[in-house]
């Protein structure tokens, strides 16, 4: 287990700020873009997009408080776990088995060129250092900034790192929109609305947006070498698009990190850099919404990444990305992963293959076995 780094002194914090500023001003290359230097000097985002198209294969990681329950990442909503009860899972969050260096080495051994990890999932728990909420890994028994550790490990080994961020769902934040606003998964269906939920009218949502933008500033300045931001869930956006200032959000990201790529599944407004559907998904996702149809038409010829998971969809066990103990003994084997890779290569898209770490953050033994023996042809 890695020990928590000592609290930064004011002088060291100032030095870190200078490094961040220097990164932006000098246009320092992230390690994973070293082979794209010439293009980067002319257009950082174009260089990053070319790298992404060449990368072909990445690792997806769903890890958070929900991992402790072993029932998938939507367990709070599906089991309508009370807010206070779910929040107490933080008291047992140690991440004692989370080893960023091991994860990066495993990804490299499997032939993966990048990692995408849940910095904040729908439950609102953050795996990074943030001043915006105490509902985070640094303020848990783990006392660790897991995103910082993984960013450092990826930079050291030349892998790209995308940060998954749940923009269109947050079951913890008081000002996210309510069930009455039009989406059945906006909040768990509690019989009595929690007092912590404050949203009453569309104007209230701006308080949540300000929170998101503040956290994006943290992510893009604390980890300036990340490859981009991977937003989710798109249906939460399609159901209520008018409350999301999506252009403002994208402008913020591109101002703070000129090379950063942006994805939001099939697309929110068509200004995304690549499409990122699930399991070969297409425009059928959200096709009942006109905004979805417009975004799809604008994005359909852009690079595409399809995510799939090492945990198969088993009858009665759910369709999960976070750890589900019901899937033990059924994770994908080498031949099954090769089929997914072959399909991706044949159809010209990237494969983002998910693992759901165990409650302590360690990689599932079945996934270690498969990825360690996966030989790309």
Where do the protein language model's features map onto the residues?
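Bacterial Sec-dependent N-terminal signal peptides
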Residues: 1-31
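Mature catalytic domains of secreted/periplasmic carbohydrate-active enzymes
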Residues: 28-377
């Amino acid at each position: 287990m890695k020990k928590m780094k000592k609290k930064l002194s004011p002088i060291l914090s100032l030095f870190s700020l200078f490094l961040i500023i220097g990164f932006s001003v000098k246009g320092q290359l992230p390690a994973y873009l070293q082979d794209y230097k010439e293009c980067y000097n002319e257009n950082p985002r174009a260089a990053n997009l070319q790298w992404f198209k060449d990368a072909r294969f990445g690792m997806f990681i769903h890890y958070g408080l929900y991992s402790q329950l072993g029932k998938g990442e939507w367990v709070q909503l599906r089991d309508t776990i009370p807010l206070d009860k779910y929040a107490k899972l933080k008291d047992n969050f140690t991440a004692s088995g989370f080893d960023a260096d091991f994860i990066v080495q495993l990804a490299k051994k499997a032939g993966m060129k990048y990692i995408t990890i849940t910095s904040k999932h729908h439950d609102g728990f953050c795996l990074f250092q943030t001043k915006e909420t105490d509902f985070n890994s640094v303020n848990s028994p783990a006392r660790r900034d897991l995103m910082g550790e993984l960013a450092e490990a990826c930079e050291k080994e030349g892998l790209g790192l995308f940060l998954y961020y749940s923009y269109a769902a947050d079951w913890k934040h008081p000002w996210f929109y309510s069930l009455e606003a039009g989406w059945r998964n906006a909040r768990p269906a509690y019989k009595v609305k929690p007092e912590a939920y404050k949203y009453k009218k569309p104007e209230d949502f701006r308080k949540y947006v300000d929170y998101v933008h503040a956290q994006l500033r943290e992510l893009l300045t604390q980890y300036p070498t990340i490859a981009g931001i991977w937003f989710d869930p798109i249906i939460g956006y399609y159901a209520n698009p008018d409350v999301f200032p999506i252009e403002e959000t994208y402008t913020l990201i591109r101002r703070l990190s000129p090379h950063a790529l942006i994805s939001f599944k099939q697309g929110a407004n068509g200004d995304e850099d690549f499409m990122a559907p699930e399991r070969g998904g297409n425009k059928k996702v959200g096709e009942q919404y006109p905004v979805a149809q417009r975004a799809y038409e604008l994005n359909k010829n852009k690079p595409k990444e399809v995510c799939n998971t090492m945990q198969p969809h088993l009858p009665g066990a759910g369709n999960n990305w976070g750890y589900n103990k019901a899937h033990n003994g059924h994770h994908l084997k080498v031949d099954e992963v090769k089929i997914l890779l072959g399909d991706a290569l044949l159809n010209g898209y990237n494969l983002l293959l998910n693992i759901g770490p165990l409650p302590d953050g360690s990689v599932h033994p079945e996934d270690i076995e498969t990825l360690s023996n996966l030989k790309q042809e």
